[in-house]
């Protein structure tokens, strides 16, 4: 018993010494608090802007290195991402900004600051508290004023969705942004017709020609050589005048990272430990002799399961709005294959119409849809006689393409029109 007490006492002493040393390390680190707001010009310069009815909003999401430089601390380490806002209230009334609409899990300034407090540095801790507090975005927007600050949101990679809501007396204005986040390379940022089709005439289609053109496209994606059919091209997105990514990121979709050494290592790690990897790369598929322009996905808690969409910008517009053709399918697991470099591939669910319907519902729930319809073009395949993709996974479909027209402003479900085009299987005449 005496020996046990002696060992216990020694263990307590060692633990106390460890705590003292750790506290000293934290304290020393806390004195190195050196924020540099002078570098904010970089993210302010790339801020996106929207305006309506006397209100002008600018927004920018900070990357990991930008936030560490500006705030003097590694906020990303704790899953925190500042979003810079500037709101000009050019009206005659005081307005109010509601930060919870941008990020329901946003952090308070004291909550952020406390994560970097030192054990023996009350003065430095107080300086941190004041610094983070003074930089938060105020909620009150005086008449004829410009108000700036930060919302301490949850960390996102690739694209950060920002829903900015400003309220006044009998008025409500909303501004939606899909803000690029500096850092890793992603598939889908900065895609423009001028860069994809340099020197080409982009033809604007009316509704009848749009339907015919979309139905005339090939059934499927291709391999890099253009010889073999891959997943079916079962999706078309007609963007609004705004950013086509907004409806997707508003519903929790993430851009996929480009396939490089870093993303391969992270993919292998997530696969071994069955971890979540929200921005994992997708294998390339080809349309117009090029791989996808945009790759989006919604992942579950394991890298093995996700729904993903690939999009290609077409050389056409509708009412001067970009037209994207693509495919949507769902990964339901992983299997061995000799068709890929790492001898494994995701297995897709065979009912690709289910995934098409899921995407339609998701976009409808975003509110950013003005109308939708279906066109021919994929070609039907039954469950008893399915087609296969490039890695041999079978799939069946009614053969139709979903065509979704996006809207700049949110709409209620009752305001969204369905075009009287083709009717997908599973919908009766009453759906017409």
Question: Which positions does each model-derived feature cover?
Answer:
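Low-complexity, acidic Ser/Thr/Pro/Gly-rich terminal tails and inter-domain linkers that flank the onset
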Residues: 37-76
């Amino acid at each position: 018993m005496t020996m046990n007490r002696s060992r216990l006492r020694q263990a307590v002493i060692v633990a106390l010494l460890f705590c003292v040393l750790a506290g000293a390390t934290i304290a020393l680190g806390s004195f190195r608090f050196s924020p540099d707001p002078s570098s904010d010009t970089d993210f302010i310069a790339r801020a996106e802007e929207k305006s309506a009815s006397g209100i002008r909003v600018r927004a920018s999401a900070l990357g990991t290195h930008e936030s560490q430089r500006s705030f003097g601390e590694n906020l990303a380490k704790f899953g925190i991402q500042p979003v810079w806002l500037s709101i000009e209230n050019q009206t005659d009334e005081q307005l109010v900004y509601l930060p919870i609409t941008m990020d329901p899990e946003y952090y308070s300034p004291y909550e952020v600051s406390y994560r970097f407090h030192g054990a023996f540095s009350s003065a430095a801790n107080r300086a941190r508290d004041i610094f983070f507090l003074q930089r938060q975005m105020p909620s009150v927007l005086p008449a004829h004023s410009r108000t700036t600050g930060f919302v301490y949101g949850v960390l996102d990679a690739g694209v950060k969705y920002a829903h900015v809501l400003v309220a006044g007396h009998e008025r409500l204005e909303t501004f939606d942004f899909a803000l690029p986040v500096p850092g890793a390379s992603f598939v889908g940022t900065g895609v423009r017709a001028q860069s994809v089709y340099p020197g080409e005439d982009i033809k604007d289609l009316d509704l009848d020609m749009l339907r015919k053109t979309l139905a005339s496209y090939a059934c499927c994606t291709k391999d890099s050589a253009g010889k073999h059919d891959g997943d079916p091209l079962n999706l078309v997105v007609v963007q609004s005048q705004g950013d086509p990514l907004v409806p997707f990121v508003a519903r929790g979709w993430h851009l996929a990272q480009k396939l490089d050494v870093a993303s391969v290592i992270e993919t292998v790690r997530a696969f071994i430990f069955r971890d979540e990897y929200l921005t994992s790369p997708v294998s390339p598929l080809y349309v117009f002799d090029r791989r996808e322009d945009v790759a989006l996905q919604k992942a579950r808690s394991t890298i093995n399961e996700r729904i993903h969409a690939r999009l290609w910008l077409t050389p056409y517009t509708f009412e001067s709005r970009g037209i994207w053709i693509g495919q949507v399918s769902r990964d339901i697991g992983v299997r061995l294959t000799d068709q890929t470099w790492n001898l494994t591939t995701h297995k897709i669910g065979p009912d690709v119409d289910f995934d098409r319907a899921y995407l339609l519902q998701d976009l409808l729930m975003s509110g950013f849809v003005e109308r939708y319809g279906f066109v021919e073009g994929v070609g039907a395949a039954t469950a008893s006689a399915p087609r296969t993709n490039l890695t041999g996974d079978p799939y069946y479909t009614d053969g139709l393409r979903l065509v979704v027209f996006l809207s700049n402003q949110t709409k209620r479900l009752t305001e969204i029109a369905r075009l009287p085009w083709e009717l997908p299987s599973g919908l009766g005449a009453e759906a017409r």
